[in-house]
């Protein structure tokens, strides 16, 4: 049976069958493997694929495939990150607290070209609970986000660095009240 990837995309990984998980993962892996880096839509699709593999499918090591080691990520509230190692650490911390996290893309728009690089903006919301999570203060609270309560917006600059396309800079803002309510 051929699956429609759009039907399973919004499901949390904990709600998916093994066949659905493997089909979705293969879909995103194919997007990455076949990216031509020629048009803005190529980059938008690529970033969505990386995001879903890193966050939903817990392939955190893929950060090293796409993020520049000298990355600077500017966040609202001043909790900035520098370097891909810090992005990995921050991602692992978040996933430990919300193991059922699912990122839902509302919109992603990209501009640019292969000569000058690309720039995109995206809006996502997170669907997650802390029921099975563990944080610095122990077991999770069991709280979860309401639909579209934890909105995140980010803008990324993609450049060719040492012959490879990488996220060179990222700026992000999120719904801090929801984040603090659920994660403390």
Where are these regions (language model features)?
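Short, low-complexity N-terminal intrinsically disordered segments enriched in polar/charged residues
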Residues: 2-61, 65-69
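A compositionally biased, intrinsically disordered/low-complexity signal enriched
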Residues: 3, 54-56, 60, 64, ...
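A beta-strand edge to alpha-helix "cap/lid" segment located at domain peripheries
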Residues: 4-34, 92-184
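Soluble or luminal CAZymes and related metallo-dependent hydrolases
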Residues: 42, 86, 149-150
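A solvent-exposed, acidic/Ser-Thr-rich amphipathic alpha-helical stretch
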Residues: 45, 60-123
